[in-house]
Amino acid sequence: MKTLWKHCHIASMAHGKYSIIENAAIVTSGALIEWIGPETELAEPEHDNCIDLGGAWVTPGLIDCHTHTVFGGNRSGEFEQRLQGVSYAEIAAAGGGIASTVRATRAASEDELYASAERRLRHLLKDGVTTVEMKSGYGLDLENERKILRVIRRLGNTQPVTVRATCLAAHALPPEYADRAADYINHICNDMLPALAAEGLVDAVDAFCEYLAFSPAQVEQVFISAGQLALPVKLHAEQLSSLGGSSLAAHYKALSADHLEFMTEDDAVAMAAAGTVAVLLPGAFYFLRETQLPPMEALRKHGVPIAISTDLNPGTSPGLSLRLMLNMACTLFRMTPEEALAGVTFNAAKALGMSATHGSLEVGKVADFVAWDIERPADLAYWLGGDLDKRIVRHGVESSI
């Protein structure tokens, strides 16, 4: 079915720029874009439907390329404790922190995890998100990592959103492997990844490279195993210290390296050469009251693509609005609104290996877009909170969220 979407202005985000088309129209055929351009250049079309967008600004559907949406439990009590002066170490010693989320996730049924994740996902969808990545990493054994990944697949099959599933078994050390990190990494590589990949539950593999998680050498083992399974890799790197994780990610042609507050210019050079995307997570930076900024000038100087994401998770970034992250990226990291919008469209698609089909409005790409009732594209990064009036189109069909 062909649909003409007319009377709009378009920020197509082609090549990662606004790439504005004034007084524009889009023709979709099924789930794909068949034509896009100034309305005056549109030949008399044959179409089944004609939809007037009322002068709206149209952007690609937003892409949240780094989330931990599926988890059990609630850590708002820890948030309150920290603000009362209890240290993270004290909370962890009492069984809190990520360990509490692992316990709650293991205890939850698949249906319970689905129900709670679906509620969180709905907030993202209402913000204009049409594609989202979700990670495992709160199960930390084969049974529970499988359970999380099954929930992620189920969300993609039942909700009006494209979902990419990432296995983050190398997120933290589970209690049964205390002081045995090498054994756990071997278990991930020899048992968990092959089984989960064989079941079709994994689109990419991630790890946490940090002094309080896994070493570069241990992460490299995971990357080698992922490569043997033909799975692309991603990496949490340089959030709290500089271990060279982002350069390691670049060496293995990772889709992305994420966080990056402590990365060096040499890391930026390596990432640029590899085409590895820098995924910045301003929500975690804000929530943890960090002070070490990502090296924005080095990223720009060397042409590293920059994406933005919510990092939605229970411990360090309980963020339910990707649009709020646009403002945070501009305010905290001094990104421009154009850079920030590219970070949740064009470059976010790159970070998921989806740039051939998603991330910009171009002929042949998937017809995922949002028609916003705004005065200019910068409004998306300008307004703090609220629910901007919008119409969301996914695969060429208007969604009601």
Curated annotation (Swiss-Prot):
One of its GO terms (biological process) is L-histidine catabolic process to glutamate and formamide. The keyword Signal does not apply. Pathway: Amino-acid degradation; L-histidine degradation into L-glutamate; N-formimidoyl-L-glutamate from L-histidine: step 3/3. Keywords: Cytoplasm, Histidine metabolism, Hydrolase, Iron, Metal-binding, Zinc. It is found in: Cytoplasm. Fe(3+) binds at residues 66, 68, 236, 311. N-formimidoyl-L-glutamate binds at residues 138, 313, 315. Its EC number is 3.5.2.7. Belongs to the metallo-dependent hydrolases superfamily. HutI family. PANTHER family: IMIDAZOLONEPROPIONASE, IMIDAZOLONEPROPIONASE-RELATED. This is Imidazolonepropionase. The lineage of its organism: Bacteria, Pseudomonadati, Pseudomonadota, Gammaproteobacteria, Pseudomonadales.
